[in-house]
């Protein structure tokens, strides 16, 4: 059995979809000859916790080493789950943080994690280090460690770093420092995995020393076990049920969908009366106020954050799932893991998205409806189209082979092959 160190700040019991990719890799890597040891954060304050996620690997003999630090979340850790700030406040705090901490505010943790890895390497042999980002400060620290120790390293880009859809640069100097850090990190890595082709293309464009063969695309996926072992929540009626699972953050908003539902009530009252829209996840108060303002209480129900297992049950109960990405710079490179949880449910998906990686996935999935993210009239008419197909029992079905290739075990086997080929070089 080969041994791999997995460096991941975001890991259970932290909740939300960002931890799923790494958790599932760790869960299935032993099936392909790789025993992971996880280096992750200690007790921190975070928007959501899901203690049940660790149950997935409790019988896998996975060593999880928790490294504390002095980042803001760690200092608030005694509070446990923290309430997310309102969107305007969150944006301000995020910009302040990005102006002070380069490459990110997890630098303290990343340095401590690297020191812990050095201690481990002094005691036992590991074949490879796998680092997932963000936080990208972990890439920098592991790059420095690689120079010292000459151990093979693989970076996993869950999102873009330089000029990402999340980035804010106070000055050109801030922007240059980010580029310099990423340049250094990429000069000291063996292989790279990314979640979609757009990220790969941007890395190759921004860092011309990289070769196509340096970067492997391993998309997000779904765990078949999550869906096979989890029964759906029974529907309360025969109305068309559309479900959205996930939080609304900087590049997503329910605003245009809520406007479309308002217009649906005015233009197509019979359709609106025979439809329900359920939101799972943290929703800003301003959107909850819109629900009341538009008098949507009979159509829209909000459920707040659910543990992953319960969220899967709710997703399975839906007739159609809604997915949204707004307009932002380089947004074409974003491909949230939530979309592949939807694919795992094998339900029709209504995507309100711009051109980009997510739209391509929806088109390949086939059981999809696509609108512009902010075209309220188009969203309204698409809802009517979906409703009519539902009443005719003629909703589209997904392309089965496309669904199967995004199963987590299949994707983890792809990752194990990246590891194996690296060791042979």
Segments the model singles out, each with a brief description of its role:
Residues 72-78, 204, 213, 221-238:
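Acidic anion/phosphate-binding donor-loop and adjacent secondary structure
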Residues 272-281, 286-312:
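Nucleotide-activated donor-binding/catalytic signature segment of Leloir-type glycosyltransferases, i.e.
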Residues 149-154, 163-184, 224:
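Nucleotide-sugar donor phosphate/pyrophosphate-binding loop at the beta->alpha transition
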Residues 198, 218-221:
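Carbohydrate-associated surface elements
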Residues 1-72, 191, 197, 413, ...:
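N-terminal subdomain of nucleotide-sugar transferases
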Residues 137-140, 144-148, 173-194:
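Membrane-proximal helix-turn-helix segments that form the acceptor-binding/catalytic region
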Residues 374-378, 391-421:
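A charged, aromatic-enriched C-terminal amphipathic alpha-helix characteristic of glycosyltransferases
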Residues 234-252, 258-261, 411:
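Conserved donor-binding/catalytic core segment of Leloir-type glycosyltransferases
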